[in-house]
Amino acid sequence: MSTNLRKTHPLAKIINNSFIDLPSPSNISAWWNFGSLLGTCLILQTITGIFLAMHYSSDISLAFSSVAHITRDVQYGWLIRNMHANGASLFFMCIYLHIGRGIYYGSYLYKETWNTGTALLFLTMATAFVGYVLPWGQMSFWAATVITNLLSAIPYIGNTLVQWIWGGFSVDNATLTRFFTFHFLLPFIIMGLTMVHLLFLHETGSNNPTGLNSNADKIPFHPYFSYKDLLGLILMLAFLLTLTLFFPNFLGDPDNFTPANPLSTPPHIKPEWYFLFAYAILRSIPNKLGGVLALLLSILVLFLMPALHTSKQRTTQFRPLTQILFWSLIADLLVLTWIGGQPVENPFTIIGQMASTLYFSILLILMPIAGMIENKMLS
């Protein structure tokens, strides 16, 4: 009797154990779909990005017109460009839902998987930021200037560091060239770290909605979850194509249709929607260094999640107090996103400060306390 090649061949065996015969909990819901959707987004972004890079020119005198050339003259260039731009938005939608699922169901207790995932978030944010600079429109240029300038808040080495990143005394040709290099390089580092993320996940197996050990009831990934994921994939692609074909500029900034001009500042400098919550936290602190630290901590706080878990139960499924706090956190993030896109004036300033305080209070203080109270209620 001949043995199955997919179970014996060194390469096929890895794929088989990761995507075909992988034992999966039988009760995982559609919230466990986002991992495969993120993998799809990454592949899609890499393919469209490579095709864009074939026609893009990373010189300040050519960058803006090369993007216009892609949109007008390249076969399906408009489609590739719009899919890449809106694909980034979709990528972040999936990331935030994936992280939200992880927090709700206590997936962060798989520390290695969680920490590599948080590192992936940082890398993805860096990639999106340098990518946003490439079209060399007004918002590209000023976002690059403002965000890189934040590093000057670092004591002693700040100014030197900023000039080193700029490659000169202002955002210029050298900056654009290196940002293009980083934007091309980082997705491949993300791919490598994604492999590590999966490696750690498959060491422990997936969590499930109950948070209990599911070893007694596992089913193979294929055909059950490969088909279940296919539904999510079709819905995601339908959403992406609707966005790309009917509302291609809905999530973009109109200022970016104006070529970069160092002599004219846009009335409201703001990043893409997926960074607005962090931008609101940055702006809510009147001190430059304090703002930068708060901005960093708003993401770094995810690394602390496993240490802040006080409950005897893993998921939030059966913990009403923590559930209220979780949904308050989601509402708070939506408020921060709205505030990040508003001008710095009352009442937006004070709302932003209150929302920022609430964000850190929920994650660092209220959730751990709620966990302890729930333990007391159980005992």
Curated annotation (Swiss-Prot):
Its cofactor is heme b. Heme b b562 binds at H84, H183. It comes from the Eukaryota. InterPro entries: Cyt_b/b6_C (IPR005798), Cyt_b/b6_C_sf (IPR036150), Cyt_b/b6_N (IPR005797), Cytb/b6-like_sf (IPR027387), Cytochrome_b (IPR030689), Cytochrome_b_C_euk/bac (IPR048260), Cytochrome_b_N_euk/bac (IPR048259), Di-haem_cyt_TM (IPR016174). A ubiquinone binds at H202. The keyword DNA-binding does not apply. GO terms for biological process: mitochondrial electron transport, ubiquinol to cytochrome c. Heme b b566 binds at H98, H197. One of its GO terms (cellular component) is respiratory chain complex III. GO terms for molecular function: metal ion binding; ubiquinol-cytochrome-c reductase activity. CDD domains: cytochrome_b_C, Cytochrome_b_N. Keywords: Electron transport, Heme, Iron, Membrane, Metal-binding, Mitochondrion, Mitochondrion inner membrane, Respiratory chain, Transmembrane, Transmembrane helix, Transport, Ubiquinone. It is found in: Mitochondrion inner membrane. The chain crosses the membrane at residues 34-54, 78-99, 114-134, 179-199, 227-247, 289-309, 321-341, 348-368. Pfam families: Cytochrom_B_C, Cytochrome_B. Component of the ubiquinol-cytochrome c reductase complex (complex III or cytochrome b-c1 complex) that is part of the mitochondrial respiratory chain. The b-c1 complex mediates electron transfer from ubiquinol to cytochrome c. Contributes to the generation of a proton gradient across the mitochondrial membrane that is then used for ATP synthesis. PANTHER family: CYTOCHROME B. The cytochrome bc1 complex contains 3 respiratory subunits (MT-CYB, CYC1 and UQCRFS1), 2 core proteins (UQCRC1 and UQCRC2) and probably 6 low-molecular weight proteins. This is Cytochrome b.
